[in-house]
Amino acid sequence: MPGTAIRDIAVVLSGGGINGVLLELGFLKRLRESPVWPRVGWIYGTSAGALAGAMAAQDRLGDLEGFLLSLRAEDVFQPRRLWQLPLGGLHDYALPETMAERIGDAAELGSALAAAEIELVVFATDVSEHVDGDGSRHFELVYRSHTTPPDTMGRAILASAAVSALVLPVRVDDVIATDGSWVRNFPLEHAYRNPDVRAIAAFRYLASYRPSDVAFVQRMRERLDRFRAVPPVRALLAELRLAEERAGRGEPAHYPELIVRLMRVAIARNTVLEERLAADRETSVLELQRLREEIVTAAVDAAPRRRRPALRAELDELFASARFPFRHDRHVPCLIVRGTPGEDGLDPSFRAEPPWPEERKRALIERGYRLADEELARNADFLTREVGKGRQGPGQAVGPRAGGRSGPGEAGA
C-alpha cells in the first residue's frame, strides 16, 4: 500500500444519528489537524460512525461536510403514507439513493475504500431468519474494507446506518442486515484486539431524547370525534384517549413507542458494557504487569547471584506464556471524547418538519471539533507515553473513562 507513515492508531466512532455524525465530523476534522492523523491505520464505526468513517478513510471530510450541510430529513428516511405503515415500516430508506447521487453508489464507495490506506471496519446486526438453535451465534456482522468485495462493503455501510425503528433491513449478499447499534454501538473492543494498534482515539455520542410527541394522537381524536356515533369509530376514540392517558403518566402511548424505548435501552446497555469491559480488562493488564514486576524482582533478589539471570528469564517466560482471554502483554492508551448535542441538537426522529437549519448543523460540527480539541489539550502526551511501561495514575485520560483507564479488545466475529 502507498505511503511510508507508521500506521498504528485506531479511530473508533459510535452510532448517533444525525447529531452524532455532525459531532463526529468535527471530531475528525480536529484529529486530522493533529499528529494523530498520519498514524491512523483503522477506523471502526457503527451506524453514523460507519458513514463518517467511510468518508474519513478516503480523506474526504470536506465532501462529508458539504453532504451533511445540504442533507434534509427526507433525504435519509422518507415518511410513508399511513396505509403503508403496517407492512413497510415508518419510512422508506432514502439514504442509499441520496448517497449515490451526491457521493457515489455502493460499489464506487467500496472500491474507493479498498484502495484507501486507512482500513474501515463497520458493524451491522444480522436479522436473517435463523431457525436452528445455535448457541454460538452472536448476530454481529463485521465488514473490513480491505478484504470485503467493494459492492458488499458499500451495502454494509448502508445496512449499518439503517435505523431499525424507522426502516426495514437491507440485504447484504445472503444476509439480512440492519443497524449495527443493536449489537456493537461503540466498537472499542475490536480496535483493542487488533495486535497492530498501539493507541486509540474514539468518539462516543451521548444520546438525549425529547419527550414523546403524542400530538398526532390528539389530532386524530379531534378529527374522528364528529363520527363518534359510528360504533367502530367510538371504540377507536376510546383507545386514543387511553393512549393519551398513558402518555400523561410517562408510559409508552402505543406499542411502536415501546419498541423505540427498548431499542434505546439495548443500544445504551451494550455501549456501557463495552466501556466497562474495556476498563476492567485494562485494569487487569496493568495489575498483572505490576504483579509480574514485583514477583520477578522479589524472586530474583532472593536467589543466589549466579542463578539470577536464568531465573529472571524463566519467570518472564512463564508470565509471557500464560493464557488469558485478553492480551496481557501491553496496555493501549485510549483517548475518548464524549459528546452530547446540547441546545443545537436536531430532531432525531427524521420528520420533515421542522427542517434542519444549516447554522445548527455548523454549531454541532464546531462542538465536536471543540470537544476533541479540549481532550487533546488535556492529554498532550497521548502519543508520547511509553506503551506497556508502568502504571497510569487516576488523573491521566488514557482509558475508556476520560480521566483514567485504557481500552478493550476485539470480539470474535
Which positions does each model-derived feature cover?
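Active-site-adjacent alpha/beta core region of enzyme catalytic domains
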Residues: 10, 84-211, 320, 325-340, ...
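C-terminal helical/tail subdomains of lipid-metabolizing enzymes
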Residues: 270-413
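Short acidic/His/Gly/Ser-rich catalytic and metal-binding motifs that mark active-site loops
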Residues: 76-77, 131-132, 211-212, 343-348
